Structure formats: structure tokens, C-alpha cells
């Protein structure tokens, strides 16, 4: 496989990176020449300033819940992250890059692994869409991140709230849609090189991209790499096990023609992150580090994970009159391995192999008297196999499908939209009888099996209805009511084993029921040249909310299995309230003062005080920044800006306290600074330069959603767990090449 990948990479680089980023993702499909390409503009307009005005963002065409529509016409709450914003934001992974958005958080395991959280809900409640299909890895796991190369992402749509209507089970919290760069116009070829460095963990990354369109034949080739040693903070020093290495390759080949397009995308992603165990010396309180270990080594410290993700997507689109028929077929292979034995470094403990086939067929009708209709079917088939010497979940087969129909109507300044969907999922879990038990117990009793075979089927009806109304030219109102559905995942139903990455013994529950939710959203936004403001409020009711609870014995002491704290999945009803507020003021030209505030209140109903709040509820967060854009002559420098930011995370007293599953988290404030500019030569952009300093005061802090917060106690200081990254400076250079 390595030989094949190297050969593909060599051929691609010889012919070989992305088109320069546009600030707003506008993919146009020109029926005259069949091209899907960026709007043809000169370089200065193509590379927009950092922040778009509210007026411009309202004109962005997004996927939404009922098909493509302008952002201001979508009743569902949607945030849009432009290419320019992604380009200037220092990060260690793609979720880290968007976690600054209001209502978006991340569950982290060190600096390299992040899981998305939307309005307090994460894991299998957030669907990730990339290359047009839902990304399927091992997203049920605490320390399993998203297998997407950040450099390959052109823009991001963040759908907040139930989106099961279009995306089926799991889209209860929302959807993250990662868009690749649109194909270029005929005759256009561009290359791109970017590189960056971060001082705290020595993170070095680079990306090469080459894209073009010759006579309708389109291609887009990218190769990226990244490596980082252990990060450090004021309390822990260098954190052993937090290093990582990453490689990614993608290749798009296709044909744009008058009546549509056919594109084949091939992706390969390889991540090798360390595992932070947080064990400490009882006398000194310092983190234990193997003898001879170099904290600045880019090697693989034991224990570590290894993730391989392969993906192939065939994307076809045809115009049928003024309607559009779209068919996507995808295959993904995800393999996750955990290596933990010094004596046998090549022998892995946990080894999951997941195969997924995705399919999506839908039709969008032509507009008729302001009405638009769409209908379709999508779903997936999965097979999971255990290949390691340790087991956490059983092997299983899964098949699901969902049929849906949507409708939208524009009546003057009023836009109405809605739809309905039916989902069905069947899961077949296989039995596993461990060899040791089989040799010592021939009675056939249940305790000789690690996993019992079982079959479960789940079904649900979901939908949404909403409106967007232009009260005034600068003032909009949105209302939306949506129903969500999520079937329990394999881990929640039948896990039984020690998970090295989480330091837990996890137990499933085969009697769990599907989650169902109702969410109501209210959104008000105002945009003018001087001030832009938005208020988004939501109320969410979830039945049969599934979570893991730490087990305790009759003396209220933790239950240990194999010397590891035991957790079991259970369920209850939940109510989540909250919202986001933002205001951006332009008191004088070129000066921007922005403030955003996010709040989530997650409560379990009919529970005692120690179980009142849901686990992993993000703390209230206030982000304030002042940005100044300098006036440049445009000959040498352009889009020069400086931004000072205060990131204030308030104290989180709402935590799941039962059996000390969670604890309160103190407040903290981070001071950050960013600067950037385009450097030009002979009127063309030579390169873009970005500088940043984050956590400038070197504050020692723990985010409430950091899993390292619950590792061993420092017996000397009394502090528990490992702290987040300290002061970090970064530099990034992006060099576009027009051919």
C-alpha cells in the first residue's frame, strides 16, 4: 500500500496544490460550459479581507436543510467560516480551527485530538460531511478525532440544531460541512504552497497543491504533512505523550460538461498521536517520563495510536431541464490501532477496522411559481472487524436508509421551508468468545463470552418547518422547529473492555432506546455599515438522552474492573437551553470591535442534584476582539491587519457530579494577538504572511471539555490532571502560484 501511495504521490506532484482561497465560497455551475468554478475575478478581489460584512455573508449560498439557498433565507441557524478565516487561524487540526465560532466547542485529548461539540452536544450527535458524504471513523470514542486534512478545507458550514431531515441519524446537534475548493474555470491552472510553525510544541506543517481545468478535464492534487513534539505549560512542563505526526494526500479527477459533472475524489489520511496517561511521581509530583526521553522528539512515544483513513467518492450531477439530479457513492476504510507494550512495540492492543459504503441520490426540481421541491434517499452500509489482541466493542454489521422530501416557497420578503424524513437502521452485533474462557469453560455459560450476539432495529420520523422574514432591508427574523433522531451506537450498546486512550473500563447497555428531540430556534440579525448584531436562541428537549456514568459500590467507592474505573451507559430525559449573541461595531473606518457570547444550560430532568447536569457541557464563553485594518497603497502590502483578542471562559459550576464523574472548572481568560498581510509584487500577490501569539500571559488553565483534566492528582500541589497548552507563537506563509 505504501508503494502504491508513493507512486500516486510522485505522479501527482510531477503534474502537482489549492486554488487561492476565496473569502466566500461561491461555487457556480455554468450550464454553458459545464464548469463548476470560482467567480472570475482578479487576484485582489479574489483574496478578500479577513472578515466579511454581515451584508455580504447574508448573500452566501449555503447547503442548509432543504437544499442550496442564501444564508439570509435559511430559517435554520447556520454559521459560515470562509477560506480567509481558516487560513489565518493557527490550529493543530480542523476542529481546533473552527472552535472559536460561537456555539462551537471541542472535547480535547491533548493538543492533537479534538471532537466537535455544537451547543453542548457532541460525539455521535454531530455529523461531519466531507467530499459530499458523511465522514465515518470511530466517532463514538473519546480520543478519536476527525480524519480530515485542514489544508484541504476551503470553507465550512456549521448547521446548529437537528439536521436529521437531510442527514439522518446522528445529526441531532448539527452538521459540520467541510467544502473543498471549487473546480477552476476552463484553461485555468494554479498551484499553492503553505507552511507554518508553532513555538510551544514545535509544530511544523506544510501543504502542496496543484489544480486545473483543461477543456473540462479537472484535477486537484494535494499533499500535506505535520509533526509536533510534546506541548508544555507552566504547571506540567512538557506533557509526555502529546506529540503527533500527520500525513494526508488527496486527488480529485473529473470532467465538467454542459449537462453536469462527474468527479472522483481519493483521500488518504494518516495520524500518529501519542496517548497522554498523566502518571506522576508521588515524591516530586512531576509527570513520569521514560528515561532518556527527549521532550522535543518528534518520534512515537509508547503508548500511541495509529489512524489510517482511506476514502473514495464518486460525485455525479446532471441537469434535467431546469432540475438537477445528484448521485454520490462513497467508500471509506478506517483503521485505528493502539500500541502500548514496550516489550512488543509492533503488537497492538486495540485494532478496529471499519468499512463504510455511503450512497446518496436526490433530485431538486426546477422552481415553479416560487416553489422548490427536492426528494431523495441516502444511507450507508458498515462492517466493523476486531483485529487486535484486546477488545472494546464487538464486530458488527450495520445498514440504514432514509427517504426524505423538502419544500420551500418564497413569498416576497418571506421564505418558508420544511420537510419530512423516515429513517430505518438495522444493527447486527457478533458474539465473541475469548480463547482463555473457551479453554477453561465448556459449559457454554454466558460468562465465557466477551460479547453476546444481538440484533436491533431502530426507526424514526423527523422533519423541520421554518421561516425567514426580512422585516427591514437590514433586519431579519428567523424561526425554526425541527425534530431530531439518533440510534444508539455500537459502543453505547455493547462495549465491554478497557480503553487505553480514556483510562476507563466501558460497559454498554443493549436496552437503550433511540434519542428523539424537538428544538425551537429564534434568530434576529441586523447588518449595517456601522454595526452588525445577531441574537440566536434555542430550546431543545431530548428524550432518552444517552450518557456514560461512573459506577460506584455500596460504599460510594469507584468500581474497578482490571484496576480501571468502570463506566456504564445509561439514559434519561434532557432539556437544553441557550444561545449565542454577537455584535460587531465599526466606529470609524478600518476599526472593528467585535464581541460574541455563547451559553448552554443542559439539565437532566427528574434527577437528583448530583446528576442534574449533562456531562461535557461547555462553560459560558465571551470573546472580545479589536481589529484594525491598515490603509495600504496596494503595491507592496495589502489587507494588513492587527487584532487583539480576549477569550474569557467563565467558571463552570454545572457539571455531572455523580460519583465524581466531573468536577467544577475555574474561570480563565486568555489574551491573544494576530496580525497578517498580503505581500505584493508588480500588482500581484506574492505571498500571505500571518503571525499570532496565543495565551500571551502563559496562563495555566484547564478547559472544562479537556479529558486530561481527570488524570492523576499531583500529590505535591494537590492539582488534578494535566493542563492545556501554555504560551504559543506561530507563523504561517501561503504562496499562491498562477500558471
Task: Please report, for each region that a protein language model flagged, where it lies by residue.
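C-terminal beta-signal and adjacent terminal beta-strands/loops
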Residues: 485, 543-544, 548, 650-655, ...
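Flexible loop and strand-edge segments within Gram-negative outer membrane beta-barrel domains
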Residues: 228-230, 240-246, 260-321, 325, ...
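Gram-negative outer-membrane beta-barrel transporters
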Residues: 538-541, 559-652
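Outer membrane beta-barrel strand-and-loop segments of large Gram-negative receptors
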Residues: 347-362, 507-513, 519, 528, ...
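Transmembrane beta-barrel wall of Gram-negative outer-membrane proteins
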Residues: 201-227, 237-276, 304-321, 367-368, ...
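Outer-membrane beta-barrel translocator/receptor signature
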Residues: 137-139, 152-154, 165-235, 242-249, ...
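Short acidic/polar hinge/loop motifs at secondary-structure boundaries
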Residues: 133-160
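Structural signature of Gram-negative outer-membrane beta-barrels, strongest in the C-terminal barrel
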Residues: 368-372, 378-380, 388-542
Amino acid at each position: 500500500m505504501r508503494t502504491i501511495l508513493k507512486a500516486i504521490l510522485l505522479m501527482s506532484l510531477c503534474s502537482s496544490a489549492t486554488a487561492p482561497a476565496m473569502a466566500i465560497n461561491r461555487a457556480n455551475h455554468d450550464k454553458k460550459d459545464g464548469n463548476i468554478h470560482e467567480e472570475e475575478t482578479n487576484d485582489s478581489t479574489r483574496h478578500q479581507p479577513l472578515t466579511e460584512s454581515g451584508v455580504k455573508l447574508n448573500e452566501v449560498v449555503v447547503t442548509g436543510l432543504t437544499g442550496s439557498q442564501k444564508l439570509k433565507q435559511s430559517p435554520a441557524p447556520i454559521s459560515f467560516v470562509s477560506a480567509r478565516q481558516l487560513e489565518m487561524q493557527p490550529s493543530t487540526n480542523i476542529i481546533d480551527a473552527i472552535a472559536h465560532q460561537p456555539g462551537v466547542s471541542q472535547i480535547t485529548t491533548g493538543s492533537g485530538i479534538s471532537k466537535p461539540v455544537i451547543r453542548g452536544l457532541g460525539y455521535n450527535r454531530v455529523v461531519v460531511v466531507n467530499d459530499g458524504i458523511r465522514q465515518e471513523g470511530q466517532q463514538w470514542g473519546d480520543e478519536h478525532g476527525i480524519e480530515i486534512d485542514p489544508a484541504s478545507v476551503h470553507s465550512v458550514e456549521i448547521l446548529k440544531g437537528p439536521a436529521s431531515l437531510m442527514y439522518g441519524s446522528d445529526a441531532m446537534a448539527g452538521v459540520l460541512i467541510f467544502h473543498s475548493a471549487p473546480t477552476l474555470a476552463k484553461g485555468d491552472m494554479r498551484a499553492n504552497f503553505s507552511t507554518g510553525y508553532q513555538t510551544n510544541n514545535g509544530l511544523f506543517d506544510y501543504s502542496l497543491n496543484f489544480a486545473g481545468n483543461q477543456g473540462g478535464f479537472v484535477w486537484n492534487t494535494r499533499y500535506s504533512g505535520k509533526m509536533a513534539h510534546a506541548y508544555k505549560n507552566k504547571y506540567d512542563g512538557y506533557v509526555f505523550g502529546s506529540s503527533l505526526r500527520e500525513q494526508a494526500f488527496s486527488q480529485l479527477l473529473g470532467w465538467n460538461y454542459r449537462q453536469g459533472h462527474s468527479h472522483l475524489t481519493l483521500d488518504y489520511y494518516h495520524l500518529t498521536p501519542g496517548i497522554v496517561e498523566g502518571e506522576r511521581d508521588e515524591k516530586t509530583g512531576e509527570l513520569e517520563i521514560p528515561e532518556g526521553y527527549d521532550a522535543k522528539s518528534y518520534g512515537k512515544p509508547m503508548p500511541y495510536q495509529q489512524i489510517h483513513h482511506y476514502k473514495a467518492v464518486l460525485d455525479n450531477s446532471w441537469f434535467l431541464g431546469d432540475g438537477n439530479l445528484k448521485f454520490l457513492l462513497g467508500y471509506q476504510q478506517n483503521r485505528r490501532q493502539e500500541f502500548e507494550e514496550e516489550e512488543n512495540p509492533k503488537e497492538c492492543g486495540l485494532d478496529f477496522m471499519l468499512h463504510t459504503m455511503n450512497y446518496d441520490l436526490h433530485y431538486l426540481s426546477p422552481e415553479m411559481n416560487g416553489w422548490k421541491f427536492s426528494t431523495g434517499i441516502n444511507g450507508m452500509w458498515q462492517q466493523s472487524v476486531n483485529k487486535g489482541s484486546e477488545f472494546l466493542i464487538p464486530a458488527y454489521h450495520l445498514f440504514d436508509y432514509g427517504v426524505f422530501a423538502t419544500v420551500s416557497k418564497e413569498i416576497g420578503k418571506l421564505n418558508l421551508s420544511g420537510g419530512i424524513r423516515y429513517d430505518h437502521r438495522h444493527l447486527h452485533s457478533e458474539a465473541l468468545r475469548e480463547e482463555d474462557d473457551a479453554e477453561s469453560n465448556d459449559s457454554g455459560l454466558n460468562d465465557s463470552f466477551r460479547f453476546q450476539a444481538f440484533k436491533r432495529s431502530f426507526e424514526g420520523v423527523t422533519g423541520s418547518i421554518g421561516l425567514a422574514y426580512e422585516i427591514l432591508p437590514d433586519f431579519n427574523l428567523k424561526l425554526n422547529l425541527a425534530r431530531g433522531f439518533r440510534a444508539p451506537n455500537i459502543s453505547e450498546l455493547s462495549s465491554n473492555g478497557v480503553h487505553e486512550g480514556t483510562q476507563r473500563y466501558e460497559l454498554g447497555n443493549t436496552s437503550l432506546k433511540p434519542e428523539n428531540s424537538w428544538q425551537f430556534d429564534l434568530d434576529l440579525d441586523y447588518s449595517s455599515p456601522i454595526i452588525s448584531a445577531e441574537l440566536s436562541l434555542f430550546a431543545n428537549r431530548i428524550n432518552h438522552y444517552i450518557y456514560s456514568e461512573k459506577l460506584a459500590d455500596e460504599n460510594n467507592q469507584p468500581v474497578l474492573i482490571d484496576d480501571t474505573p468502570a463506566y456504564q451507559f445509561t439514559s434519561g430525559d434532557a432539556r437544553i437551553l441557550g444561545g449565542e449573541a454577537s455584535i460587531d461595531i465599526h466606529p470609524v473606518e478600518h476599526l472593528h470591535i467585535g464581541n460574541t457570547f455563547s451559553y448552554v444550560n443542559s439539565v437532566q430532568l427528574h434527577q437528583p442534584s448530583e446528576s442534574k447536569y449533562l456531562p461535557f457541557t461547555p462553560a459560558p464563553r465571551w470573546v472580545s476582539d479589536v481589529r484594525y485594518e491598515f490603509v495600504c497603497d496596494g503595491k507592496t502590502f495589502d489587507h494588513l491587519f492587527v487584532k487583539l483578542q480576549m477569550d474569557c471562559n467563565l467558571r463552570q459550576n454545572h457539571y455531572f457530579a455523580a460519583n465524581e464523574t466531573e468536577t467544577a472548572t475555574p474561570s480563565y481568560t486568555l489574551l491573544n494577538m494576530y496580525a497578517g498581510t498580503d505581500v505584493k509584487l508588480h500588482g500581484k500577490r506574492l505571498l500571505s504572511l500571518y503571525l499570532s501569539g496565543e495565551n500571551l500571559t502563559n496562563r495555566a488553565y484547564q478547559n472544562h471539555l479537556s479529558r486530561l483534566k481527570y488524570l492523576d492528582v499531583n500529590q505535591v500541589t494537590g492539582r488534578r490532571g494535566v493542563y492545556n497548552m501554555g504560551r504559543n507563537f506561530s507563523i504561517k506563509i501561503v504562496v499562491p502560484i498562477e500558471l
